[in-house]
C-alpha cells in the first residue's frame, strides 16, 4: 500500500454528496494486463498482451474527472506494466492537473533515464518496484527470467539519480522468507524511502504451496516488528 506523510496529508480534498465526510485517500487503477514478465505470484495474472476491455484513454480521463469532483486522492497506477501503455504519461499528467497525486508501479524492465524524466514531468511523485530477493537467483526465480534482478537494481539507480523517490515491495513466500534480512539490508543500501512487505495470498498465478505456515507467519511478523524499531526505513506490512 502507498502511505507516508510525504505523500498523504489529512484534510485534503472535498466531500461529495454521496460520500460526505469520507473522501477517498487512495485509488488504484490497474491500467493494463500487459507485462513482459510472468511472475509466479502475480495477483493480476498479467499477460504479454493487454486485455481487450481495458479502459481507453478517454474513459480513464472521465473517471479521473469524476474523482476530482469530490476529492484529491493518490492515484496508484498499476498493471501489468503501466509503461506498456503509450498514453500513460498523458493520463498521469491529466491526473496531476486535476489535483490527484499519481504514483506508479512499473515492472522495472522498461526504465531508462529518459523514462524517469517523463515520469517526473508528468507528475509521478513516487514509484514502487518489486524486489523479492537479495540475490539474483532468488529474485529471478519469482520472475521466471534471468537478468531481472540486475534490471531492477538499474531501475532503482536511475530513479535515485533522477531524484524520483521510490519504495520497494517484497512479497513473502516460503521460497524467500529466509532472505528477508538480506532484502532489508539491500533496500536500505539502495536508498528506498519505504519497504512494503506483503504476505503472499494465493490468488492470480500464485498457488497455495507458496504460502508460509501460520507459525512462520507469526515469526516473520515478530521479526518485522523488531526490525522496524531500529531500521532507517519506513517498514509496512500488508
Model features per residue range: what roles?
Residues 1-3, 7-8, 50, 55, ...:
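Radical SAM enzyme [4Fe-4S]-AdoMet core and its adjacent flexible, acidic
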Residues 2-122, 126:
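Conserved alpha-helical substructure of the radical SAM core
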